[in-house]
Amino acid sequence: MRALVSPALALALTLGVSVAALSSTPALAAPENYATIRMKTDTAFLSPEERKVVNLLIQAADQMTAIYDKQAVAQGGADGPGHGFYPPGMTKAEFETYLAAHPDQKASLMDAYTVVRREGDKLVAVPYSVAYKPELTKAAALLDEAAKVTTNASLKRFLTLRAQSFRSNDYFQSEMAWMDLEGTPIEVAIGPYETYTDEMIGQKAAFEAFVTLKNPTESQALDKYKAYLRDMEANLPVADAYKNFKRGGASPIAVAEQIRGGGDNLHGPQTVAFNLPNDERVREAKGAKKVILSNVLAAKYEGILSPIASRVLVADQAALVSQKYMTLETLFHELSHSLGPGSITVAGRATTVSAELKDIAGTAEEAKADVMGAWNILFMMEKNEIPAAERPQLFATYTAGIFRAARWGDEEAHGRGAALQYGYLKAKGAFVFDPAAKRYRIDDAKMAAGIRDLVADIVKLQGDGDYAGMVAFFDRYAHLDDDARGVIATLKDIPVDITPVYPAKV
């Protein structure tokens, strides 16, 4: 291992962070190749009441980590793709065979908020509220206490209802209340959300927490884009049958600094934004909230994306990569999660994209959001909301971002999604490898066409609920060739990702 001077210096100068450890190994996405960053966030503006609430939420977030530790690894046996959600040693084929033989149990066993356990020859669904009762009881008590402290009515309502959800296993009302948070700098998401950890079926939600503080000025600057959501849906390069105008249009946008993470949020590559909730019922009623974690994004740009650009792209295009377009891509990635098929009909059955695409649903959705985010920025350029002359900056930043994510490995949803984008767009001629420069050159016209075509192909497969088709699509394109692997091999001294360390309290 060796210390990384340049990324550390960039991070320290830009963010005022101290770098606890930086190291490098040949393995892609190995934990040793993460930069450990002690994050500092401005909390001076918090009132004593808000400070007390935040510190209670930090404690509750730690309970999400305790639960996730049980979910991420099989309990009492060898670990596998089902991790702690399913019985040790269970295979996908065994589970699906059981479901076919016991259709009356399918709803409970496939529920996002249950753990599957064996009882003799039977499988039983254990609600999260029972399986993780000790941790959820502690978390609920902390949320109840925070609800008593805050005088903000919307935050009080959300925290009270979320505490009830932890006890009842019913999250609908608290998800609805979360969408209505207003009048407070505190933006907290806490509970079972993403399903990436369930690598067997892709249905079980992992517990996590984001404790953040909003920046109202930066949030307002980006808020204008949500008014275009219906126009973005209409502009998708697919037939109207694949477009979804049923989701709610509220879709709040917040720019925030994260002051604590918990559970799945702390595992593996750090997210720079989130788009929640995932419950299609809530999305159809109220839309979804997009939160950009500005301090995490800045750390990744300065320490990872910016130095990657000069190794991946020819010099004149590497110079175009910018934090502005990383931020815009992040925003439009999250907006794009609210676009395209969600609730669908397959062979006369009412179902969802997630249910039909199973274990590949999350990976496909991340690839969709990446490329559709770029497509929607191009649309905003057509609407004169973003300078059209900056299209080369968009393409350069987007391409560098593909390589940043590809380093996470093809076992990780975003990493495999990046490999798909690489393989597809290279096949379309969107970029070519320059052997002399040992770097890539982007063809702007072919990149624009490739982005359009990739959006269309993914959305159609999602809308059809075509599991076999999506698997075949990834099998065809989600590969890094020798050129890509050669370029990635030059990035070993640049961290794959960051491990942020947050204060124990504010």
What are these regions (language model features)?
Residues A30-R162:
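N-terminal helix-rich structural modules
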Residues A374-M470:
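Long, well-structured alpha-helical subdomains associated
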Residues D111, V124-S322:
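Contiguous, non-catalytic segments that form substrate-binding/exosite surfaces or channel walls
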